[in-house]
Amino acid sequence: LIKSIFKNLCPNCGGDISSERLYKGLVCEKCLPIEVVEDLCDELKYGRIRLLCDIRKEIDNWRKFFKKCVGSEPWSLQLTWAMRFFLDRSFALLAPTGVGKTSFGLSLAAYLAQKGKKSYVILPTRLLVYQTVKKLYGFGVAEDKILFFGEEDRKEEREAKLNRLRNGDFLILATTSMFLYKHYQEIPRGFDFLFVDDVDSFLKTARNIDKALLLLGFSESDISIALEAIRLQSKLYKTEEDWNKINALTEKLRELRRKNGRAF
C-alpha cells in the first residue's frame, strides 16, 4: 500500500492525515500522537469526534434519567429527538398521539434543570399548564425551580411570580402561548430549551416564531439574515450575484450558529 497524505480529511480536526491512519480508522497524528485500539473517546481532548463522544454520553445520561422518570426505556424515535437536541438542532416532533412527544419534552426540561439550564414549556391551555407542572414535580423537579401562571393566582401571588419572571428566578417556565403574547417583554432571553406543545395553535398568533427565536438568544438582525437567505434560495432562477449573496449569508449563519451554540 502506497502511503499517501490526504489534505483536510482528518475526521476530527479537518487537518491532513495519512492513508495508514485512515485505513486503521484513526485520526491524524496531531489529534492522537500515539495509535490506540481502544475507544477514541477515552483519548481525544478536542475536535468533532470528541464532540460526538460528549453527545453520546449526554444522550445515555438522559436515557437513564428518562427511564427513572417514566419507568421504561425511551422509544428509538425519542432517542433520535434527543440526538437532534444535543446536536443543537431545532426541529418539529411529527408523530401520532401517544408516541411520547410530551414525555420527551418534559423529561428533557427536567434533565436540563438538574444541570442548571433553563427551559420554557409553552402550552395551548391553562389546564395543560397545571398538568405539565404536576408531571414535572413527579419527575423530581423542585417546586422553587418551576414558575407557572394560572387564572387562580391572587393579585399578590401573581405579582410575586412576575417579579420572579423578570429576575429569571426559575429553571423551568411553563405558560400558555397567550401569556407569551401578552408578557413577551418581561420574559428573559437565553433559554437553553424551548418546547412548544401543540405547535399548530402556537402558529396561529403572528410573530410567535420570531419571539421564540428571540427568547433563544437570536436577534432581529439574525432572523432577517436567515429570511433573506431563504428568499434567495427559493428563487427558481438564480444569478451569479444571487449565489454570491447566498454564500455570504450562509457563512454569516454559520458564524451565528457557532456564537449561539451550546456546549453540554
Task: Give residue ranges: language-model regions.
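N-terminal helicase ATP-binding lobe
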Residues: L1-F264
